[in-house]
Each structure stands twice: as C-alpha cells, then as structure tokens.
Curated annotation (Swiss-Prot):
GO BP terms: DNA-templated transcription; viral genome replication
Keyword Phosphoprotein listed: yes
Underlying gene: P/V
This protein's name: Phosphoprotein
Compositional bias (Acidic residues): 148-160
Source species: Phocine distemper virus
Bias kind Basic and acidic residues: ranges: 79-99, 285-300
Disulfide cross-links: none
Keyword set includes Phosphoprotein: yes
Domain notes: The N-terminus consists of a long intrinsically disordered tail. The central part contains the coiled-coil multimerization domain (PMD). Forms a four-stranded coiled coil structure. The C-terminus constitutes the alpha-helical domain that binds to the nucleocapsid (N-RNA complex).
Pfam family, one: Paramyx_P_V_C
Length: 507
C-alpha cells in the first residue's frame, strides 16, 4: 500500500510540474468536459454507466506521458495560481523522462523531488517511505514501479469507516499556500481527478468513478479477474493475476506479482491455480484500477449452496459420531470404576487369606512341639474311660506309663506292668533300669491330673478361693465364703467345705 501511494503521489507531482512547463489550452479542457457530460448523460439513460465511465476515463487519460497530460489542465493551474507567489523552482521533466526510458521496458525507475525542485536522496526502498505531515520543505516522495493490482476502490472499501489519514498510516497534508497543492485547485474536474484519489481513494461521486492513469509500461489494469494460463512468449515480464484474491473457504491463495527486477532474461510462467483438489476455494475478486468484477454465474451460486448443504450434513454426521463415542467412553469408564472396586475387594480378601494361613501354620508348629498330658495309668477300673483312648493321635507325657520309652533307651521291649509288680528288678541287670529311676504310680489320695484332693495347705486353699471367685454366687456370699475359708483347718473340714462349694457353684 505504501508503494502504491508513493507511486500515485509522485505521478501527481510530475503532472503538476509538467503543467507549469507546458500550460494547456482552455478550449481543450472545455471540449473534454463537454464530451464527458454528454457521454455520462447517454450512459445513464441506457443503463451502461460502468462501460461509459471506462471510455471517458480512457479519453481523458489516453496519453501516458507527463508532458502530454500537461496540455489538458495547465490553464486551470495558471488561473488558480495568479497573484500567488511562486516559491517552487522548475523541474526539468525532460531529463527525468530520458532517464526513465534508458532503463528499458521491463524496469522503470522514478525519482522523488520536493517542492523546491531538489532530488530527495537516501531513499532506496518504497516500503520504508514515510511522508510526514509537517512543513512542506521536509517532505519527500519516492516513486518506484509498483503493481497496479491493488485498486483505489479496494482501499476505499477497506478504509471507508475511518478517516483517510489515520487508516492509511501516511499523511499527505499539503500546505494550501504552495502553488503545487492539489487540493486547492478550483476547477471541479481536476479536483475530482486528483483530490478525490488523494483523500478518499477512488470513491464514487455523482455516478462517476475515479480512474488513475495506467502504468508507463502499458495498460495492464483493465484485465479481468482471470489468471494468465500461458506465458507471454517473449522476453517480457509476466504480470500474473491482476486481482487480490479473498478466500472464505479453501487453502491456496494466489501468489502476488514480484516487484523486483530480474538480472537475467525473463521466463514465461503461468498463474497459480485458483483451487486445489482437496478443498474447495471461494475466491472473491476485488475491483482493481480500471477493472470491473465479473458477475457471479447462477450455476456457481447453486454449486456453492449444494456444497454448503453437503458440508453441513457432513458436520452433523461427525457431530453425531463424536456424541456416540462420548457415550461409549462414559459407559466404559463406569465399568472400569466397577472393576477397580472389585479389584480392591479381591486384594483385601487375599490379605485376609494370607493372614489365616500364617495363623494356621503357627498353630501347626506349636502342636508339633507340644505333648498334651493325658494320663493313661492310675485310673480306677470302674471308670468307663479307663480303657478308652480319647484321642489316639495325642500321646501322653512320658512317665505316666511305667516303662514307656525304655525300648528307645535300652533298644529292648519294656517290662510289663505285671512283671514290675510281681517280680523285682535285678540291680545292674542288662536291659533294665534301677528302681529309684522309675516313676512311682499315681496316689489316689493326693491331687493329680485325675482329680483334686484338698488338704490343709496353702496351694489347696488358693485353688478353693479361685473356685469361689469364678462361681456365679452373689458378691456378698463370695466374701462370706472367703472369710470362712481362712478359718477352716484340717483336711477333713477343708474337703467338706470343698464339696459344699461344688454343690453350690455346680462345678
């Protein structure tokens, strides 16, 4: 955009300075104005205003050199600037034209002059051109050959909502006291031609469209919004696509024209395709300088509508598929939560089983190392359990049976119980033990594992006191019995007291 603005400003300054050198005739200006008014009226009646506007513009701007343009509006400048002090020095336009023509048809170079007629130096790139809004003496413009692809009508559409100075980024405020100020020209047509493009950028006024002059290389601004499919066939620069493509859908944007000059011979090249195979592209061609947008065809509108319907249906299908996937994921997650709970319960059960196994193994270890004392000798013959083994797997303690374990010690069968009673043992006999080493049989009148026989002794009284405390008698009766127990003396009295306690407590 900066390059285009600098280009138009430099061209306008050239035209103004050239008009001072060769003032035009007022008759020619009046003739051109009459022709344009007549053509405008006829085109308004026939409904072909757009086509006639282009013809009018071409009639006005049919010359491309600054010297020929000066023949059409110089009298207006001369009349408007009478009585005004001329503060600017003349510029030799002929020298600049000779320098421009020496660069060749492919590359055209413009130079920037201030209002004093001096060339501005140090500006090499048009993109870095800054046009200040200060005094006219500090202003400089640099014009390079820029692409006419971006039209003034496009810029008016983009910046019509705000003011021109703030939206365009550059201020072209000229001092109205200077003779070269374009905005102070009093003639209506010249103001519409130059002042409108400077301030509004090509807005339509009174049914007329402002058209800027074509490039000195040739008329390339009247091309339609269609790409060049083939090369030029000659060593000329291919201008490519003359529209700025706006994409609403699709992927590929048209490539702009390269503004740099080529060092070698130029090769033929085609434009970038407007569409790709994987995505449909809707391209909106913006109006360029000297061009009109082509009307959309009905079949294209219908195809766009069908494409939108298909796209909407596909989006709906994708949305339903995503919803189904979400529901499936939710059900799967709920089942996973249940599985996690079951896994925790299974782990707790496994821990309990392992604890039970440890307890069982501990009990088994204790049972293998302990022998329970079940007497097998000393019972009365009238006892029904005398000859019955309660638990044959549990062995009695060694010593309850006389002569038990002698076979393991002497490696011979032990003596029977009858032989022990009838015949005596020979001391020192082979295979027999001394009598003193043998255990005595259980005394029926003394306390043993087969029964409690109370005696007037402290252990017997302690056993009876324990029986009283564990009984279900009232606490007051327990205290009375314990006090009586302390005063009892003698085996018979203690045995009688024991029998009474057994009857009371149902032992």
């Amino acid at each position: 955009m900066a390059e285009e603005q600098a280009y138009h400003v430099s061209k306008g300054l050239e035209c103004i300075k050239a008009l001072r050198e060769n003032p035009p005739n007022m008759e020619e200006i009046q003739e051109v104005s009459n022709i344009r008014d007549q053509t405008y009226k006829s085109s308004k009646e026939s409904g072909t205003t757009g086509v006639q506007e282009e013809e009018i513009t071409q009639n006005i701007d049919e010359s491309h050199t600054p010297t020929k343009r000066s023949n059409s509006v110089s009298d207006v400048l001369q009349e408007d600037q009478r009585g005004r002090e001329d503060n600017t020095a003349p510029v030799e336009a002929k020298d600049r034209i000779e320098e421009d023509t020496q660069t060749g048809p492919a590359v055209r170079r413009y130079y920037v002059y201030d209002h004093c007629g001096e060339k501005v130096k140090g500006i090499e790139d048009a993109d870095s051109l800054m046009v200040p809004a200060g005094p006219p003496s500090n202003r400089g413009f640099e014009g390079r050959e820029g692409s006419l692809d971006d039209s003034i009508e496009d810029s008016s559409e983009d910046y019509s909502e705000g003011n021109a100075s703030s939206n365009w980024g550059y201020t072209f405020g000229l001092n109205p006291d200077r003779a070269a100020d374009v905005s102070m020209l009093m003639e209506e047509e010249l103001t519409a031609l130059l002042g409108t493009g400077h301030n509004a950028g090509g807005q339509k006024r009174d049914g007329r469209t402002l058209q800027f002059p074509n490039s000195p290389e040739g008329s390339i601004g009247n091309q339609a919004c269609e790409p060049i499919k083939k090369g030029t066939g000659e060593k000329l620069a291919s201008h490519g696509m003359m529209t700025a493509a706006g994409l609403t859908n699709g992927a590929t944007r048209s490539a702009p024209k390269s503004t740099g000059g080529s060092s070698g011979p130029n090769a033929s090249a085609g434009s970038v395709p407007q569409s790709v195979t994987t995505a449909k592209m809707i391209q909106k061609c913006k109006t360029e300088s000297g061009t009109r947008p082509q009307p959309e065809k009905p079949n294209e509108i219908e195809s766009d509508g069908e494409y939108d319907d298909e796209l909407f249906s596909e989006i709906q299908e994708i949305r339903s598929a995503i919803t189904k996937l979400t529901e499936d994921n939710q059900s799967i997650l709920s089942k996973l939560d249940t599985l996690l709970l079951l896994k925790g319960e299974i782990d707790s059960i496994k821990k309990q089983i392992s604890k039970q196994n440890i307890a069982i193994s501990t009990i088994e270890g204790h049972l293998s190392s302990i022998m329970i004392a079940i007497p097998g000798f000393g019972k009365d013959t009238g006892d029904p359990t005398a000859n019955v083994d309660i638990n044959p797997d549990v062995r009695p303690i060694i010593g309850r049976d006389s002569g038990r374990a002698l076979a393991e010690v002497l490696k011979k069968p032990a003596s029977s119980r009858g032989n022990q009673k009838d015949g005596g043992l020979i001391l020192g006999s082979k295979g027999q033990l001394l009598k003193d080493l043998q255990l005595k049989p259980i005394d029926k009148n003394s306390s043993s594992a087969i029964g409690f026989k109370p005696k007037d002794s402290a252990p017997s009284k302690a056993v009876i006191a324990s029986l009283i405390r564990s009984s279900k008698v009232d606490q007051s009766h327990k205290q009375n019995m314990l006090s009586l127990l302390k005063n009892i003396k003698g085996d018979d009295n203690l045995n009688e007291f024991y029998q009474m306690i057994k009857s009371i407590s149902h032992i």
